Amino acid sequence: MNLLNLFTYVIPIAICIILPIFIIVTHFQIKSLNKAVTSFNKGDRSNALEILSKLVKSPIKNVKANAYITRERIYFYSRDFELSLRDLLQAIKLRPKTINDVYSFALSYHILGEPERALKYFLRAVELQPNVGISYENLAWFYYLTGKYDKAIENFEKAISMGSTNSVYRSLGITYAKIGDYKKSEEYLKKALDAEPEKPSTHIYFSYLKRKTNDIKLAKEYALKAIELNKNNFDGYKNLAEVNLAEDDYDGFYKNLEIFLEKINFVTNGEDFNDEVYDKVKDNEKFKELIAKTKVIKFKDLGIEIDDKKILNGKFLV
């Protein structure tokens, strides 16, 4: 067979055979990715991980990378932070780094008690996408989590000026509630709820607001709705426990607090019991025993090393 025949007949025929197979395989593997996410959202973590353990072996590089990043999110929300970070590192070896990777590292560092490292990533995201609202929204969320509410509001408002809406409304709602501006808090949370009525976090924030304004009945309704919308969201149980405590339902408080502590396995940065509602039980032996049993995890406890400079530098797909 001469070279002309190779290019004229053989290669086009091979492409016609291989390309449809590639498209079909990719299609079914993407469906499997979606199935894994659905399984996790329904509470079937083991089935989701079983599906993804097969997809990370895919011969198709893009599918493999997406499987790692999907599994990374599941590990993250399941609080297996070491496995989450390992999968994130695998994903960025297989495809160009993205802005979402920056946020994943940033949030992991914050949760694991490395705020200085987290801030570097959030600021890098602003450098990479200075004209995109999500960059400022995520930076604002960092400031919120570290209690710098004025800076949080400043950056949330910047995000709104760039077109961000629903999630920023939700974030501004809880931020204003934290500083005691309940009127503005309600204004923003109503906007968030109108736009996305099925978001559990909006119901949690509304529950917090109503508890702070002594509308305990409505606070409980929002708390129960948040759990109904997502039983995996451990924050919902902590919030409901706080509502129980506000209404002097100590059995309900301990029941939901124990569910929360069981789901989180350990306490990370930002998960505290400093709300004034805990004054009711801070000297209670049962409460002290529960908190004493709770483990705290930091980044240094993980058996993993990450070269921040290498990750933050270089090209990004933005």
From Swiss-Prot:
Swiss-Prot/TrEMBL keywords: Plasmid, Repeat, Repressor, TPR repeat, Transcription, Transcription regulation
Known role: Transcriptional repressor of the sol locus (adhE/aad, ctfA, ctfB and adc) genes for butanol and acetone formation.
Record Gene3D superfamilies: Tetratricopeptide repeat domain (1.25.40.10)
InterPro entries the UniProt entry points to: TPR-like_helical_dom_sf, TPR_rpt, Ycf3
PANTHER family: TETRATRICOPEPTIDE REPEAT PROTEIN 6, UDP-N-ACETYLGLUCOSAMINE--PEPTIDE N-ACETYLGLUCOSAMINYLTRANSFERASE SPINDLY-RELATED
Stored SMART domains: TPR
Organism: Clostridium acetobutylicum (strain ATCC 824 / DSM 792 / JCM 1419 / IAM 19013 / LMG 5710 / NBRC 13948 / NRRL B-527 / VKM B-1787 / 2291 / W)
Name by which UniProt lists this protein: Sol locus transcriptional repressor
Pfam family, one: TPR_8
TPR repeat ranges per the UniProt record: 65-98, 99-132, 133-166, 167-199
SUPFAM superfamilies with a match to the protein in the record: HCP-like (SSF81901)
